[in-house]
Amino acid sequence: MVDLFQWLKFYSMRRLGQVAITLVLLNLFVFLGYKFTPSTVIGSPSWEPAVVPTVFNESYLDSLQFTDINVDSFLSDTNGRISVTCDSLAYKGLVKTSKKKELDCDMAYIRRKIFSSEEYGVLADLEAQDITEEQRIKKHWFTFYGSSVYLPEHEVHYLVRRVLFSKVGRADTPVISLLVAQLYDKDWNELTPHTLEIVNPATGNVTPQTFPQLIHVPIEWSVDDKWKGTEDPRVFLKPSKTGVSEPIVLFNLQSSLCDGKRGMFVTSPFRSDKVNLLDIEDKERPNSEKNWSPFFLDDVEVSKYSTGYVHFVYSFNPLKVIKCSLDTGACRMIYESPEEGRFGSELRGATPMVKLPVHLSLPKGKEVWVAFPRTRLRDCGCSRTTYRPVLTLFVKEGNKFYTELISSSIDFHIDVLSYDAKGESCSGSISVLIPNGIDSWDVSKKQGGKSDILTLTLSEADRNTVVVHVKGLLDYLLVLNGEGPIHDSHSFKNVLSTNHFKSDTTLLNSVKAAECAIFSSRDYCKKYGETRGEPARYAKQMENERKEKEKKEKEAKEKLEAEKAEMEEAVRKAQEAIAQKEREKEEAEQEKKAQQEAKEKEAEEKAAKEKEAKENEAKKKIIVEKLAKEQEEAEKLEAKKKLYQLQEEERS
């Protein structure tokens, strides 16, 4: 109480005009039964609830119908013994669960808020323009994955959900995903619009904020993009000694701050619009970070100057725990389980972790949290892939962390929506029931008895956000400390309130407990699917696979025949081409031969003509020579004749 009055004094000095508000808050805290006492005390579990439930209206409580649900869990502690069977680790008990309540969302109001923003007003131009506003909302806008916390000083539930815009009208192909904060009253009715006087944890200043509202996040996007923006919001409360709630919002985002990869970010919307990238020192960032589970230690720093530190379960297998500054985003790995402390990859990120809502006598250095991770099982008997919540008890002893308890799958008696929204739970390709956040854990005394109700937000089939109320979970867990009835033959006395971490047994038993829980979850999955469309889905799947196989075989046969025909045609064309080349070669050779013969004939004719000419010339020469000789002889004869005549004349 001293811390509360110190804060009130500081707060009143800064804002004298808020004295009245301060007094109202103080009276409200007293009325609600808040006790600012240490979280570790000596003695049995101390119930220090309010006189009446602080989270629920009586009329709402009276309207809830609870039914029993079995929670089959497995423990890592067996009094120091190394266990080899699931039976030796098994713990079974009952809790009660309410029916699911789907949380309404005034999408028309949210859409107008988005359109009025400078960053996202252009989305209005991407909607179909030839349909009504109601049709546009139904076609282009989608929402799911809501995580909430209860703000006691305002008596409202603060919920952060994803709101997606799809230009093509498909939730699995959004242009962008945004974070929207909403308020719900104690009966889970949406408050739209509703204004709260928000106290800034850093300055003490009071500022009115109207909800629903967009949470400011610097998103790098364009109208032609797909799958940009924020995903998987988780909201959790930072511990406070002043009674002023400070919700922290965790989400992942693709950003140039992490080289275009998808990184983890946090923001404190009641403190400032600042968004911090969580960066682990000396660790290469994977392409996509997700599924971190936040929790606070008892020694969390409470200061108006600093947001302090938060821890995360970075992964369950191997178990890795990191510590991050909420002021800078700087993180470092503080725990990693050894090789023997590892199991399969079916266990995924959990809800934010919360402490038990009672004061336990815990040894120094020991802290205990409750959370709901989810399993991801393939081909277990309900759709191809099945997501379901499981209960875990997470423990810190000194500088060691481990899972004390892990349950089989829990569906809270929900017939999970089919992923295609067309058939039974298991009729789609995947069956999705994901726990998003622990809103509150209310403890009350009434008519000499006591009651605890944990409120959990979940999402079905990536289509909605629902809330369920779990009654009696605290009793279920306190049995592990020797309180209340034992439902089986084992004694788990002082499991919570003693240190029993032994490196040679606890890690091995934790692995065995997880394996047993996964095995049990597979058995649950099979039984769940047998009555919720799995046989029909499987038969349809087999028929589709048969048809697909026949189609592929037919296509393969047709392809083979086509390839064969193509090959035969290619061979025919090749043979024809070869024959054509042979013909052309033969014709060329014949042409060459004909040309050669013509040349030879021409040469022969020429030679014959030349020979004939030579012979004729020779004959002519002979004739000429003969004529010349005859002429010469005639001339000689004439000369002799004349000489004779002359001689005759001389004689005469």
Curated annotation (Swiss-Prot):
Residues 536-621 are annotated as: Disordered. Residues 1-15 are cytoplasmic. GO terms for cellular component: membrane; microtubule cytoskeleton. InterPro entries: BMT1, MAP7_domain-containing. GO terms for biological process: cell wall organization; microtubule cytoskeleton organization. Pfam families: BMT (PF12141). Its main location: membrane. This is Beta-mannosyltransferase 1. It comes from Komagataella phaffii (strain GS115 / ATCC 20864) (Yeast). The gene is BMT1.
